[in-house]
Amino acid sequence: MPDAALDTTPVPEPRVKPRIGGALAERWCLLAVAVGCGGFIAAVAPPHAVIVTLVVLLSTATCARLAVLEWRQPRLGLRTVVVAIGLVIASAVVIPPRGSNDVWSYAAYGRMVSVHHASPYNHVPADFDGDALYAQVSPVWRNRGSVYGPVFVGFAAAGTFLAGDSATATRLFFQMSMAAAVVIALALVWRRTRSTAALLWLGLHPLFGAALVNGGHIDALVGLAVLVSAMLAARRRGVAAGVVIGLATLIKLPAFLALVGVVAWGWKQRDRRLQFRAVATAGAIVAVGYLPFLPGAFRVLHGANQTVTPGSLWNVPAEWLVGNDAGRNLFPYVPPALTTMSYLSLALAGVLAVGLAWRTMGRRRPDQAIGAATASYTVAAEYTLPWYTAWALPVLADRRPSPLAWVVWTQSALLLAAWKLPLPAEGAVLYNAMMGLLTYLAPIAALVAFTVVGVLGTGRARASLDPKHNTGARRSASGHVGLVEDPPGRGRLESHRAEEETASSNS
């Protein structure tokens, strides 16, 4: 036997475990920062302050880094991710709304029906200034009727009936309802991606997990409905998709843009039945829902707020033409120039919705077309708020979000950061710099990025994802091209058999 001392074979150093441990430690640190920032935004931060804007930006960067690390190599377990997101959502629910008073407007419109037996399309909260919760309503909205659809008015009426005159019970009803909508959306994202990175990307976003729930914004319901409609459209269930889009439109009118994505994707799939059923069903539901309230609803919508919001791309032309902080200092007076811009912004949103839905319709799934069409409003509108991006974020969440999804995700954070800035402070260098970046430069950059990525970035991916050009496209065990992945327990063997059966039936 050779002497063991003569064996000069080098022994490899155990480098793997330290590397894994270091990567895991970094993720735990990032997770702690993301949860801490989310909790701070939801439960501690003042409504508007430069420090809050900085925390929003830090939270966004942390969440992005964490999601990218998990996409490259998953390390965090599902339970860990769920607990982290749950902590943020819980902190958002237990604290009264801090960054928005929308909940009290919802309550006022609901109580008009449940308590005063009046229509929120023909009356305003000021007509009932003796109401138990009237003092909670923001003065800006006390003389405006409901711009929300009949489905949400009915939902708010039911909630305020159950809550009675209790302000705490009322705000908890809306906050917990939106928390439930967020949780269901995250569960559906997990069901179709099986990706903790996708959950982190969506659930720890400072807008989606913290601000949306704490404010009790009904946009969470719209985002859930848009996601469900995409899942139904992918399964060629046009009537069901139309029902969901119609009901979402009866919550907020811009939800109808999701139908543009369904129609575009159906056109590419040469599924005229899907297109017709979705359009006919959604149109019928919206018509029937609004018909009893049409005169009052039309009057309210015609007089809707035409203010330029801080994150809107129309800040630059409004400042040039009107001045006075893009006309915001003149509120409630609205100069004619802002009214013209409002109509132009709606036209731009429509053009973007149709154009980008058309460019993204070649994907295997309708998610991109529906998400692009829906997000067009938040990118182009004169009056756009951070929580409006919740309409498109769930449907764009994926194992590997597209460049378009990243643009919408980033714009959402920038809108929230701009919204958190305080009122103008003369001479504050940091504030003025952030105001210039977030309210003037960022919205224009978001429009350019959204358009370029939508036209060019998604176009390059179409050929590789089109089943005609990609014979290796995965199919689920049911034979549908993969909206929902094969459930656990139905592994590659069954998927392979399904592919063989499909191939034999086509040959």
Task: Show where each model-derived region lies.
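Intramembrane catalytic core of multi-pass membrane enzymes that act on lipidic substrates
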Residues: 75-175
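Transmembrane-helix signature of polytopic, membrane-embedded enzymes
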Residues: 80, 189-207
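Transmembrane-helix motifs of polytopic, lipid-linked glycan transferases
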Residues: 61-68, 169-196, 351-357
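Transmembrane signal-anchor helices characteristic of membrane glycosylation enzymes that use polyprenol
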Residues: 31-44, 59-103, 117-120, 283-294, ...
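Transmembrane helical bundles and short interhelical boundary loops of multi-pass, membrane-embedded
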Residues: 2-58, 278, 287, 291, ...
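Loop-to-helix entry region of an early transmembrane alpha helix in multi-pass inner-membrane enzymes
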Residues: 150, 164-184, 336-345
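Specific aromatic-rich, kink-prone transmembrane helix
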Residues: 187-188, 222-237, 374
